[in-house]
A protein has these predicted regions:
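Feature 926 captures the class I aminoacyl-tRNA synthetase adenylation module centered on the KMSKS loop
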Residues: 2-30, 34-138
Length: 138
């Protein structure tokens, strides 16, 4: 369980650390919103990239709270806590992949997401498939 919590905390704080480092190298104006045709509809400040890592940290603490709460519901053992921690690890991995994708788009000021070889939908649905396999085997 200790090893899983180390992985959990690493995945929880890694995006914040990476974005804080990348902030110095990002252009002042980055694409902040895309429409359904993958075209930029709004440009924003580079500091807007901090929003998603902060949400990731808050989500991580929420999952830790749920793990503690669920462990109290179980009389003996820690299966509920284990499931919550693993679900949190899988979810945080998805968040990290999304943040990496968005940072790549921000660094290159990509105006059309269709020009990136790996589509965000392919990435997320592929990772969701792997997540379902992992969660189904707990």
């Amino acid at each position: 369980m200790k090893k899983k919590k180390i992985i959990f905390y690493s995945l929880m704080f890694l995006p914040l650390i990476v974005v804080l480092i990348a902030l110095h190298f990002l252009p002042e104006r980055i694409p902040a919103h895309y429409d359904f045709n993958n075209q930029v509809t709004r440009w924003g400040s580079k500091y807007e990239t901090l929003i998603f890592p902060v949400i990731t940290v808050l989500f991580g603490y929420f999952m830790l709270g749920m793990a503690k709460f669920s462990s109290k519901q179980e009389e003996n053992g820690s299966n509920n806590e284990n499931v919550c921690i693993v679900a949190g690890i899988v979810s945080l991995t998805l968040f990290n992949a999304m943040i990496g994708y968005f940072l790549y788009a921000d660094f290159n000021s990509i105006e059309n997401l269709s020009s990136i070889a790996l589509d965000i939908n392919q990435l997320l649905f592929g990772l969701l498939g792997v997540a379902m396999i992992i969660l189904g085997n707990i």
